[in-house]
From Swiss-Prot:
Belongs to the NAGSA dehydrogenase family. Type 1 subfamily. This is N-acetyl-gamma-glutamyl-phosphate reductase. Keywords: Amino-acid biosynthesis, Arginine biosynthesis, Cytoplasm, NADP, Oxidoreductase. GO terms for biological process: L-arginine biosynthetic process. It comes from the Bacteria. It comes from Geobacillus sp. (strain WCH70). It catalyses: N-acetyl-L-glutamate 5-semialdehyde + phosphate + NADP(+) = N-acetyl-L-glutamyl 5-phosphate + NADPH + H(+).
């Protein structure tokens, strides 16, 4: 299969190529960039080695439509909503790693992202690619909207509780921390070494664009879900997200009940691992991999459930989940191209 990556020089695009170059069903990967044209990919990213034909090209949608069966968008907001409709209309499958097609309500998107997006026709056509919970729709998708990094960690952690209606709908708190690569490759003062090193910063307080994305999916599982409290922090590491989730139980629970629920919910999931009683995951334990590791606890004193969910923001939170969705869309083994163990230490 021939595939294209638009935005190949960003962190998400680089990770896509890292996995796709070893994918058994991908024969050629065309690389497109708005910032670099005509140079070999390895000149900018020597770590990938000399990949035959990996020349960065100027974005050409018509050429992609003629040559490729699937196009990945690893681009900032506003790019895929402009270019993807042409590809879709020509029968090309599109997997979008940006937020352009995640929200079904255009007015909600415009309020949180401060820009316009695609028409309702394409928003309604888009399938949300939380692989573990939306596989049936993903199998039929032509336009796949890959979840954001924070929503992936939060939703995988919350899904069993919300779907089984075990927690109070107005009690959800998600306290999330991310490595600096989540901010992208473009230089900024906030991600300057001197600003980030030996420092922890909260940002976008009550205003992060992933809030409506998380709430949209939670309400699809339980229409009574109320607005959540969601906080995001930048921490001095390159990769990784830890989402610590708190919610009030509707009735008294036990740790055994919770663990049984999570193990049953994810027993057929290739990339979600539930920890043993009293064990909680660390970001280092999923580094460079497509795994989401989850630990759970119940506080009898407060009646609250605590869920800890960790992912690599560039893999399960971006490129890895996108390839996992590609595999499901094409009817391939879900693990194809993704079975790399985490890098440790």
């Amino acid at each position: 299969m021939n595939i294209a990556i638009i935005g190949a020089t960003g962190y998400g695009g680089v990770e896509l190529l890292r996995f796709l170059q070893h994918h058994p069903h991908v024969h050629h990967c065309s690389l497109y960039s708005s910032s670099q044209d005509g140079i070999h990919f390895s000149e900018s990213f020597p770590h990938v080695g000399e990949i035959e034909g990996a020349i960065l090209q100027k974005i050409d949608v018509e050429q992609m439509a003629d040559e490729c069966e699937v196009v990945f968008f690893a681009t900032p907001p506003g790019v895929s909503s402009t270019l993807a409709p042409t590809l879709i209309d020509k029968g090309v499958k599109v997997i979008d790693l940006s937020g352009d097609f995640r929200l079904k309500d255009r007015s909600v998107y415009e309020m949180w992202y401060k820009r316009q997006t695609a028409s309702d026709h394409y928003l309604q056509q888009a399938v949300y690619g939380l692989t573990e919970w939306n596989k049936e729709d993903i199998q039929k998708a032509q336009l796949l909207s890959n979840p954001g990094c924070y929503p992936t960690a939060a939703l995988l952690g919350l899904a069993p509780l919300v779907k089984e209606r075990l927690i109070e709908e107005d009690s959800i708190i998600v306290d999330a921390k991310s490595g600096v690569s989540g901010a992208g490759r473009k230089a900024s003062l906030n991600t300057h070494f001197s600003e980030v090193n030996e420092n922890v910063k909260i940002y976008k307080v009550n205003s992060h664009q992933h809030i409506p994305e998380i709430e949209q999916m939670l309400k699809a599982w339980n229409e009574r879900i109320q607005p959540i409290t969601f906080s995001t922090h930048l921490i001095p590491m390159t990769r990784g997200i830890m989402a610590t989730i708190y919610a009030k139980a509707k009735k008294e629970l036990s740790l055994e009940t919770l663990l049984d629920l999570y193990k049953t919910s994810y027993e057929d999931s290739k990339f979600v691992r539930v920890r043993k009683p009293g064990q909680f995951p660390a970001t280092k334990e999923v580094y460079g991999s497509n795994y989401c590791d989850i630990g759970v606890a119940y506080d009898e004193r407060t009646g609250r459930v605590t869920v800890v969910s960790v992912i690599d923001n560039l893999v399960k939170g971006a490129a890895g989940q996108a390839i996992q969705n590609l595999n499901v869309m094409m009817g391939w083994d879900e693990e194809s191209g993704l079975m790399l163990a985490p890098i440790y230490p």
